[in-house]
Amino acid sequence: MSEEKQVGFVTMGDQRAGEDAIPEIGIGMLGYAFMGRAHSNALKKIAYVTWPPPYLPKLVAIAGRNEEAVREAARRYGYEKYSTNWEDVVSDPDVQIFDNGGPNDTHLEPTVAAAKAGKHVICEKPLGRDAEESYEIWRQVAATGVKHMTAFNYRFYPAIILAKQLIEAGEIGEIYHFRARYHQEWVMDPEFPKVWRLDKKQAGSGALGDLGAHIIDQARYLVGEPEKITGLVKTFITERPGGTVDVDDAFQSTVEFANGANGTFEATRFAAGRKNQMRWEINGSKGTLVFDAERQNELLAHFNGSTPGASAQGFRNVLVSEAYHPYWEHWWPHGHMIGWEDNFVHELLHLLTCVKDDSPISPRGATLEDGYRCAEICDAIVRSDQTGQRQTIEYRTL
């Protein structure tokens, strides 16, 4: 009787160093709160979601202003080291990608410095506090030749990518209208304190740059370039515990696109009952598409004449969870839904793939130029509110 071979454990360290080893890429993060947490979580999930990934993200260093908070974040998220000085992250030779999830007033200098140090960069939106600052970030980073990305995460929702595919295939025909709104309620209480998002020096703007930037980018991504725009900007509560509020609570706009479509943009932090509703509707000559971020796995669609019999015409609710839908080959069996956080995985996976393959960030992702163009549109909305006149949108070039 032959003796059976005892295999025992195989040491994974040997496997990782073998011929099929997947290269690591060092990540440096600025910001430990909302976006720093979301991005760190996504980076750690990439290898769980897709195998083999283009790189294995290595969480090298994280920086933030509060030492106690950034130390806790480094421990929770799994970073090797932390600092209260972003320059330590930018200068670290083990960092190849700099992820800027800090407040808006920390976008310009750290992002530019990282690019000049040879790091690929991704920066949260809004890119800068205004168009001038956003242009400077784009101009200086683009000159270095690194990959650069503005973190418009809604571009990576499978239902939104499906909508773009349907539009580009001509399924809804010529686009007539794009109507978008982004509604939240989190600052309605007059006793809610003045935080950095309510401070112009730190944030640049309020609902316009925070929420409006998303729907403006969606408009550009799905429909095309806005050409003329009007704006109404409003602050409802000007005094709060902690000081005077000098940013907007809400805005509304009418817009005319270069391709002849028209539409409306609206965002507010004063919509009672609305937690995080980013919703748009696109009407075309052959149909309509509707998306609501609070039901992110669904796309509401109507196609003229697609259902036999006039009495059965109407909208259909497409559950975007099949393996042939965008990014779903990485996830679960159909009907097993993904959530808000998972779209950051798609976003950062795209960045890693573009770095690995030396492929363009755009059009799937947003570049820093897209971030700058969004800022020009935001500034035009403010000018319209100040002057009472419709504004023509003009972009600078490099």
Language-model regions, residue ranges each:
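Core-facing hydrophobic residues within beta-strands of well-ordered domains
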Residues: 57-59, 95, 175, 226
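Beta-loop-alpha module in the N-terminal Rossmann-like domain of NAD(P)-dependent dehydrogenases
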Residues: 66-68, 77-140
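C-terminal glycine/acidic-rich active-site capping loop/insertion
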Residues: 2-21, 153, 228, 244, ...
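Hydrophobic residues in well-ordered beta-strands that form the structural core
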Residues: 83, 123, 129, 148-150, ...
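Glycine-rich phosphate/pyrophosphate-binding beta-alpha loops
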Residues: 213, 266-274, 336
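C-terminal capping/lid region of NAD(P)-dependent oxidoreductase domains
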Residues: 5, 146, 173-177, 383-398
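Predominantly a Rossmann-like dinucleotide-binding segment in NAD(P)-dependent oxidoreductases
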Residues: 146, 154-245, 252, 299, ...
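N-terminal Rossmann-like dinucleotide-binding module
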Residues: 2-77
